[in-house]
Amino acid sequence: MSILEWFWNILCGMAQYLTFSKNLTNDNLVNIYVKSNVGGTISVNLDPKSDIKNVKELVAPKLGLEPDDVKIIFAGKELLDSTVIEVLDFFSDILHAVKVNKKIKNVIPDKPLCETLEELHQLNDQKNVESIEESNLKNEGKNKAHFFIYCANPCKKINTGKLRVCCSECKHGAFTVDTDPQSWADVLDKNKITGVCNNVGCEGLYAKFYFKCASHPSQGENDTAVPLNLIKRNHKKIPCLACTDICDPVLVFSCDNRHVTCLECFKNYCGSRLKDRQFLSHPDFGYTLPCPAGCSNSFIEEVHHFRLLTDAQYEQYHRFATEEFILQAGGVLCPQPGCGQGILIDQNCNRVQCSCGYVFCGKCLEGFHLGECLNPTDVPFLSQNCDYPLDPEKLEKARWDEASSTVIKVLTKPCPKCRTSTERAGGCMHMICTRANCGFHWCWVCQGPWERDCMASHWFG
């Protein structure tokens, strides 16, 4: 794409966005953008009751052609002259005008994609075949979107979406499909549906399907959204597996049983698993969850479904996913309270220093120490030298709350030799362990033996 074409697309997108609120004029005319396959975009005003034949009559003279020499393409279909504008799944989108090439076999005009998908949906339902879902609910005639998407910009939420088609090679919208998609696999997988690209100089053979948000005016051909293929209209009236209510829409898991849950119960399910940190790290799908019934082959592949969580929960989900990735890669998380930064470590080096300044052992995640790591029950307590021994497990249960242990970890560091917690109350960084039979000299900063380098660099911090 040249700089001029890129700049033109930006201007078209801005014009569409700024003028959409004025699309309905005093004469009830709708402003429509028609893009030619030889470059340039034409703006025409039409009555919503107008048909494609009227579009050709307005557009053809501006292209120097006769109406019969022009075909109009929208969402992978060459439209019939009798197709009425208002029945299209159209929301400030772009129609494509292409000169008819009489030397080659042209595609037979067809119904718009939104109508043919309705017919396919009913047929596939009878055959019990997975199909692209659409809504048969009443009072939804004006909303032709049959999909759910996550709109990252500007809506930043889950909305209904609309299916669009372009050439997989040049990404131009003047592409007609040979057959309609029969399943989600046809839409999501590459090179499933063949067709003809009408863009000059392109010989692309495969369709690329993508989705746009139906809740805001199109911001250009590059305005896309993430499809949420598990969220569907509940036209079958299936009850939720948790609350047994019949809700719409619902989420249908990919397990063999195709378990159904309402969106509210799905949010509760994800929230409880997130709180207990029970999401699983899948090698192909990332940090995700399976069907709550424990079915095999039921992991959620598109993680944007978790956008149903609150912003705070989704931020926590992202943090946990990042931490899990680091742990799976052999890294560690800084044990310093209030930090938790992920660190990829050298497996041959036990001494790890976080950017927060905390130095710890890469194996046991305790403060850095010399010698072998000790089991938690082997860590010495100062109280063991008196007549009042404390059991670590019972001591853990006897806490008022976790605040005291957090303060201790922040204000103290363990002796690198014997692990006795030591608090620094000012002064220099030269520490001497006070535990009997230890007396190890060490550096508060690097948590290693007190040496000349420490004297030079760390004496006062």
Curated annotation (Swiss-Prot):
Annotated positions binding Zn(2+) 8: 443, 446, 454, 458
EC number(s) stated in the UniProt entry for this protein: 2.3.2.31
Entry binding sites for Zn(2+) 3: 240, 243, 262, 265
Stretches for region TRIAD supradomain: 236-461
UniProt keyword S-adenosyl-L-methionine, yes or no: no
Phosphoserine PTM positions: 92
Gene3D superfamilies found in the cross-reference section: 1.20.120.1750, 2.20.25.20, Phosphatidylinositol 3-kinase Catalytic Subunit, Chain A, domain 1
Domain Ubiquitin-like as annotated: residue spans: 30-90
UniProt protein name: E3 ubiquitin-protein ligase parkin
Source organism: Pediculus humanus subsp. corporis (Body louse)
Lineage of origin: Eukaryota, Metazoa, Ecdysozoa, Arthropoda, Hexapoda
Gene name in the database record: park
